[in-house]
Amino acid sequence: MKWQKKGLLTTMLVGIALMGVACGNKSNSSSNNSNKTSEYDYVYATDPDNFDYTVTSRATNSTHLVNFVNGLLENDKYGRLVGAMAKSWDVSKDGKTYTYHLRNNINWVDSEGNPYAKVTAQDFVTGLKHAVDAKSETLYVVQNSIVGLSDYASGKTKDFSKVGVKALNSKTVQYTLLKPESYWNSKMTYGVMYPVNAKFLKSQGKNFGNATTNGILYNGPFILSNFTSKSVIEYKKNENYWDKKHVYLNDVKLTYNDGSNPDGLYKSFIKGDYTQARVYPTSADYKNVVKQSKNNITWSDQDSSNYGFVFNLNRQSYTATSKKTTKAKEDTKKAILNRDFRLAIRFGFNKSAYNAQSTGDAGAARSLRNELTPPSFVQVDGKDYGDAVAQDLAQSDPAAFSGVNLADAQDGTFDAAKAKQYMAKAKKALQAQGVSFPIHLDLPADQKAALTLNKAKSFKSTVEKNLGKDNVIIDIQLLSEDKYLAATYQATTAAASDYDLSNASGWSPDFDDPSSYLEIYNPNSGSNLMNLGLDVGTSKTAGDAAAKKSINMSEYGELLAKADAITNDNNARYAAYAKAEAWLLNSGIQITVNSLGGTPSVSRVVPYSGPYAQSGLFTSGDSRQGSTSFKGVKIQAKPVTIAQQNKARKAWLAKRAEIAKQEESSNN
C-alpha cells in the first residue's frame, strides 16, 4: 500500500486486529462464540493519531480509515479494481485522461449515522486540494502524475483550477495526467485521492481529521462509534452505505493490547471473547494450543509488504545510545558509511533464526523476503520481476551476489563465511581511517513487546556470533512504547531518527508498479529517506551531503528517472526498475527480512471472504487475503478447519488464475 507508514506498518503490530486470519480452532473448543457471527472482536496494538485520510501515511491510521471512507474504486475479493463511489469510468485513447461517473444516492453521514450530504464530483476536487494545503504525507503518490499538481504544491502557481482534476458536473470527475500510467486506477484506492465535503471541512477547521468519532464524515461501510486511547476502538455498520448488503458485520470491537502477553490471545479466543487469535509456536503454552486445536491451526500467505532493517547514514540524535564519547559516535558513522561493513552485517544476519522467534522453526522461512519488491509483483517478459533483479544484482558484483537466491520463503543472503570476508575488508579500510573496534550499533526496542524484543535479541546473537564481538556489538536500547515510536516509526524528520539501525518500520505499495517500492528512497523525493537519516532533496547538513555522496545516491536517482520515463512498454519499464532495485540491494543500506503473513492462527473468519489487494489502502498483512477492510468479511459460528481453509484457498487461487488469463486475453 502504502506506508505502512501506508503504506508503513510497524513490526510492533503483533496482534493487530485487522489481520483477520482464515484459520481456526477445534469446532468444539469455543462454543461461546457461536452466536457472534455479526460481530468481530480482536485487539489492536497502536492508537491511531490522525483521521485525515488525505494526509496520513501511517498504517496505524489507514487500517481504520479504509473502513470509514471510500474512494472512486475498491478491490474485490479477487483483487480486481471495481467501482466504489464510481459506477463506471472511461480512459482516453492516449491514456492521459480518466473520467469517472459517480453512483446515484451516495451519502456522507455523521458519526451518529445521520445523512449529511450527497457525495459529489466536487468532493474529489476538494479532497485533492485539501491534501496539498494540509501538506499530505502521501501527496507523492500523485504529485508527479496529475497535470499542474506539482506546480501548485510547490507554490509556483496558486490557482488550483490549473490542476488536472475537474468536476464536469455533480456526477462526473475527470483527471488529466502528465503521461500515461497503466497503473493509474490502482491509485484510486489511496486516501490522498479520497473525497472531502467542503462544507464539513470548513466547519471543522483545524479539527478536521482529528482522531475522534466526529473528526470526519463517513461514506464507507462502517462508522467509528467509540475510540478510547489505549483501551478500545469500536465500529458500527453504516446503514446509509451504498453497498450495505455486502457488509455482513454489524459491529467491530478492537481492544488495546501492548503485546506483553501473547498467549492471552488464544485464551481469549477459547473463552469466546475474540473472533480470532495469533498463536505462537515458541510459547511454552503452545503445546496446549496444539492439543486443543491441532486440526485448526492454519498458516497465512505472504502479502506484498516488507519489513527489515535500515541503517541510519547520518545519525543526529543520541538520546537512546550506549555510546559515551564523540569518537565512538564518529566511528560508528564511518563504519555505517562503509559498504563492506553494511554487507557484512547483512551476510552475517540469520533471518530464519530471527523470524523463528514468533513462528517457531516450522514457520521460520514462510514469510522471508530478500528484496524490497516481491519477486512476483509484476512480470518482465513472462518471468518474475525478481529474476531480472537477481540477474542484474549478480552482474553488478559477482563476488558478492553471484548465486544469491532472491526468491521468497527462504534466506537468500545469510552466509557466515562471506560475512567474515566482508568484515575483514571493512575493518582494514576503517582502521586506516583511525576507527577503533568493536563498532557499537544502537538498536531500539520496545521493552514490553516480548516477541519483537526476542527478534532484536536474535539479531544481536547471530550478528555478533558470525562477525565477532571484537568487531561488532549490537546495543539493544530498551525503551517505553512512546519513546520507541518517537525514535523510529513516528519520527518525521531525519534528525529525529534516533538509532544506528532500526527494524521498527515496513512498507507496502501504494499502487501496482515497482516504483511504489523503489521511489521511497529517491534522493529527491523519497518518503522513507528519513528512515535512512537523510534529508529529501537539498541537504540541510554537511553530514547529509557527505552520506549521500558516500553511497552515490545520485546514481540511484538517475536509475529511477530512467525507468519512470518509460511509459509505453511495461516490460522495458519493469526491467529498468529491476536495475534500480539491484543497485539498492548492492548498496546494503537496507536489509529486507520478511513480509506479513506466514503466521499461524485460529479463527472464525470465513476464508477468503473479504477484499484482496496487493497495493493501496486495502492492503495489510491480512491473512484473510491481504486487506484491512471488513467489507464482505463473514464470520461463522464454528472455528475454521484446515480442510476448509485449504479448499477455499484452492478455489480462490483458481479463480484468480482464471481472471488473470481473461485480462491477458483482453489486453492482447
What is the predicted role of each segment?
Residues 363, 399-509, 595, 656-657, ...:
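Ligand/substrate-recognition segments at binding pockets and active sites
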Residues 122-124, 174, 250-251, 305-387, ...:
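Alpha-helical secondary-structure segments
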Residues 87-141, 331-337, 342:
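Aromatic- and charge-enriched surface segment that lines or borders ligand/interaction sites
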Residues 346-393, 451-461, 492-668:
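Detector for C-terminal structural segments
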Residues 123, 133-200:
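Surface-exposed binding/hinge segments that line
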Residues 160, 171, 177-255, 264, ...:
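Gly/Pro-rich hinge or "lid" segments in bacterial periplasmic/extracellular proteins
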Residues 225-240, 255-324, 352, 356-361:
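Extracellular/periplasmic solute-recognition and catalytic clefts
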Residues 43-93:
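N-terminal lobe/hinge region of extracytoplasmic solute-binding protein
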